[in-house]
């Protein structure tokens, strides 16, 4: 964003034209988070510009070509997402996985996930579900299950020891 004065890399075009910086990718892949068992979740609270700059500085790459850094970050994301997928899915038994959210707009990222996971990657748009609405739909389903007093978790996904009813209902004023 900073180097190109853009909000995002549309379809991963800038990253697609970059080259992986092997030592940067190897160093980032050593982050302890990636070896934690699922379930897990993270985001900008850990992985932000300062995190990338710290790795670049440690490798004396503070002046690396921005497109090469982007390419390395796309590969980092594709590898770690693919590794996580493979812990819960046998690629030989799955026809496709479906992406939603902001990453679903990055065609290059989806291609790299498909290559690394050996599973076709499509977007939820192909299922008639807007990629920007999937999270809202999921939370609506959680709420429906709560109202119906039915469990809404899967032990193999959440790591819970048993199925349980999620959330709470409170009386309004």
What is each stretch, according to the model?
Residues 1, 79-164:
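Catalytic phosphate/nucleotide-handling subdomain of diverse soluble enzymes
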Residues 1-78, 162-173:
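Conserved ATP-utilizing enzyme core subdomain
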